[in-house]
Amino acid sequence: PFGHAGEAALTDMMGTPFHHNEQSLRVVDKLERDGDGLNLTYEVRMAILGHTGSRIPETLEGQVVRTSDRIAYINHDIDDAIRAGILSESDIPREIADVLGSSHSARINTLVENMIANTQNTGVLSMQPEVAAAMDSLRSFMFDRVYTNPVAKGEESKAKDIMRKLFDYYYTHPDKLPEDFIPQLDFDGISRTICDYIAGMTDKYAIYKYSEIFIPTAWQVR
């Protein structure tokens, strides 16, 4: 949960780097089907592992997933920033909007359709240079205006605090883990088991569990 803030929190608590792509591969290889894994193909597994980070996917399937992930998260992050009042559509530089479009759907259509058309023309998974440059500029803009924004950073510290408190709670109360995770304690240890459980939460579920554990239930007024 909580994107890169959650990754950073789990890294601190585990004492080793936590990467969500590696965790996703762990889920399908080792955790699903009661530890038997899903027996996925090499291509699918490498697409999961290579969708982010410095590792460039070896397969076309992996390259499609990696590019699709970038298209998705940039545009969803714009929507989140607009809802949070950090950004408005009019803040996006005109030179970027002129190439990609000035709405969520327009940007995604431009990027996806251009990638398909240019790949068909060149035989290499790619976008036209102008569109690729606009996407890179949009990503840089998001780092300048959103990812390092003090408001966003403030929310990030709250998210990390939720993660740490959940981790500490389950570390001292492992019996409170879901029943499915109890057997895992014997062969993966307490920290790894808690990490797997928390890493599988959504933002909303992490907040719900935090509230359930740490926020007193209000007295019902009669």
Predicted regions and their residues:
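Aspartate-rich (DDxxD/NDxxD/DxxxD) Mg2+/diphosphate-binding motifs
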Residues: 1-15, 21
